[in-house]
Amino acid sequence: MKIRLTDIEYPFVTAGTVFTFTGEHPFDKEPVDFMLCEYHSGKADRCEFAFYCVSGYHSGSLEYVLPIEAKAQGTVVAVSTQWLKEHWKSHVYGGCKACDVTLTNWIWDQNEKYKSNTKE
């Protein structure tokens, strides 16, 4: 099952989530997969997450280390969904908008629990 990044109501995503989009140069014009991975850069202005390309010719390449502002609030070790929605094109990958990104390998049951707990 896939879901668009912009359709996610859950406040964060965790390591192992795969983000799929249609690539442009330097990627092939076919689906590109970025996986959110833990990455401890040791720099104060970076959080402990990065995107690695996990498809095609660039598979295994480190693509982007996320800034500290991307970290989800609270004690959870995750990335803010809102930050990704707002900064996908400007920070993560400039070749597409957040509405063109789909997620797979995401924690669906937590999303359903979150939805049911936030309804009045």
For each predicted feature, which ranges?
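Basic/aromatic-rich interaction segments and small domains that mediate binding to polyanionic partners
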Residues: 29-68
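Generic secondary-structure microfeatures
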Residues: 22-25, 40, 83-84
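Intrinsically disordered, low-complexity, charged/polar segments
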Residues: 55-120
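Intrinsic-disorder/low-complexity loop/linker signature
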Residues: 7, 27-29
